Amino acid sequence: MTLASAGHPPPIMRLPGSGTRPLEVPPGPVLGIDADADFPVTEVPLRPGFMLTCCTDGLIETPGVDLDDSIAALTGHLAQADDSDLDALIDTLVAATGAHRQRTDDVALLVLHFLGQR
């Protein structure tokens, strides 16, 4: 899988047996600023059970809270989440990251769960 960053928080990867962690993806320019912009890419091999979570900062950003702490909290929630129902997992992540505050920004969350070749 090929990934690029366009001004968003780092994607979080979960692999069976390898844990859950933010991926180091070189930052690119904010999406839509320059139609001719080049984006550095990162290659990630797909293995059965691979899960990738991508979000906008509206999901995790809280005034007065360090963004790295918010990313770490989301990583922890993803590490503990049940992956048998992605709809429920997404609901859990949205609730866990916003239950204590009023959101002031839009939220986008994408979760990919690779089950393997069929």
How would you name each of these model-derived features?
Residues 1-118:
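Conserved subregion of the PPM/PP2C metallophosphatase catalytic domain
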